[in-house]
Amino acid sequence: TNGFAPTQNLKKQLSTMLTSVGGTLIGKNVVIGPLTNIDKGTIYNTNISNNVYIDSMVMIGHNCKVEKNTVITTGVVLCGSSKIMSNCWIGANSTIKEHVTVKKNNLIGISSVVLKSTRINGVYAGNPARYIKNNLKI
């Protein structure tokens, strides 16, 4: 019978359809640790702003934006099109869901899973991440 299976031609067509037109922009004074992956943008660029520290084994998906003075620690996953605003600290092994914004001056606790956009100046932790308290100063 003729079941559904990818063929060489279908693979080529899909590859052509999914070609990325975006790139990756990395600012000044950025540190990127070993075994870190930063995907280029699909339509828009993936942007890493100035003065950002990205530790080892971090995965940054397509179209993500990381603003200035941010620390992303070991094992963090930023799913596609997520945004980390300025002056944030993302705890080890945390995950930020796609299309979610971590607003400025936020601290995300270790192994947290952020499923919804945060408010400014917050401390969040847990799975799913919940607002803990106001973070007046990082």
Feature annotation, model-predicted:
Residues 136-138:
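Long, low-complexity, intrinsically disordered extramembrane tails
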